[in-house]
């Protein structure tokens, strides 16, 4: 929201699966409420809509869900009055973009999906000890993932679990660099502090570092090179899109379309830019 090169068209509050420990009950409404709070803090209320996503998950790979967010994605993708590239940044499930594709398949070559989620690819990375096969964001709506991977030709940039887990920010950095940066910095630091408390209540320990795993959504869209725009400072490969199984694992598919899978991310640029923008905002300079 603080990136001057980006024209934010909408923010969509999405669901959490039933039974998810983070689910507050009316999950979509709470997501919209949380987003509106951030939008208000950055002084952008009314500049773009904050919309509700679907209230539920896909039951099969052919039937779309309905929501204001889904319809907005379709309308935005089908615009013919702009040459700007359109990115759909997904930091949770793939529910909205999956249903948008089912309702209007022509959006596939008119946007790029940047998704934080999915299991490690066996040929690229090992799975962390104790990590479940069913990665958290995919677990929110596995069928949506199957729609995008197995039944669409959507242009997909994937940041799988091994990659987003590397976006570590220490508690000391949180307290000394983020928390002092005005109302917004204090709010973000407090929200991350709540995670540590919640983990402790479950008998665990959050340790000294937390993965700010959704941050690559900014890195890979707003922070591209000025010439021949691309994500030059982060490593990625093109991979034949595997078949996504119901258990969250992949089955190789040599005939799959090419998808971009990210590995090593430019944390220096990503977190340096985050702190710099929060400093500018706190000083009233953006």
How would you label these PLM feature ranges?
Residues 1-29, 55, 59-172:
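Active-site histidine-anchored catalytic micro-motif
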Residues 35-40, 100-102, 144-146, 204-205:
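Intrinsically disordered, low-complexity boundary segments flanking structured domains
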Residues 1-10, 136-139, 155-286:
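Conformational coupling and interaction surfaces
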Residues 36-39, 116-117, 141-143, 184-188:
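Short, surface-exposed, polar/charged, turn-prone segments marking secondary-structure boundaries
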């Amino acid at each position: 929201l603080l990136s001057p090169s980006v024209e934010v068209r909408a923010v969509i509050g999405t669901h959490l699966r039933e039974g998810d420990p983070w689910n507050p009950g009316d999950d979509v409404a709470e997501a919209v409420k949380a987003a509106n709070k951030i939008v208000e803090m950055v002084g952008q209320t009314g500049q773009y809509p904050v919309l509700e996503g679907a209230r539920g998950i896909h039951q099969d790979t052919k039937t779309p869900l309905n929501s204001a967010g889904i319809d907005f994605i379709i309308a935005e993708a089908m615009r013919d009055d702009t040459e700007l590239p359109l990115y759909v940044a997904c930091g949770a499930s793939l529910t909205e973009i999956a249903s948008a594709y089912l309702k209007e398949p022509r959006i596939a070559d008119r946007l790029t999906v940047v998704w934080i989620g999915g299991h490690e690819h066996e040929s690229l990375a090992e799975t962390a000890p104790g990590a479940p096969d069913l990665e958290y964001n995919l677990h929110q709506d596995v069928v949506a993932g199957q729609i995008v991977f197995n039944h669409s030709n959507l242009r997909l940039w994937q940041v799988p679990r091994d990659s987003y887990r590397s976006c570590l920010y220490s508690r000391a950095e949180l307290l000394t660099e983020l928390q002092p940066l005005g109302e917004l910095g204090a709010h973000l630091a407090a929200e991350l502090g709540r995670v540590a408390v919640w983990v402790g209540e479950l008998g665990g320990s959050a340790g000294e570092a937390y993965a700010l795993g959704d941050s690559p959504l900014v890195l890979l869209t707003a922070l591209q090179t000025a010439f021949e725009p691309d994500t030059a400072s982060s490593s990625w490969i093109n991979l034949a899109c595997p078949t996504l199984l119901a258990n969250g694992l992949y089955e190789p598919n040599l005939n799959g379309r090419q998808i971009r899978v990210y590995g090593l991310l430019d944390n220096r640029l990503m977190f340096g830019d985050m702190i710099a923008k929060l400093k500018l905002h706190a000083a009233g300079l953006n």
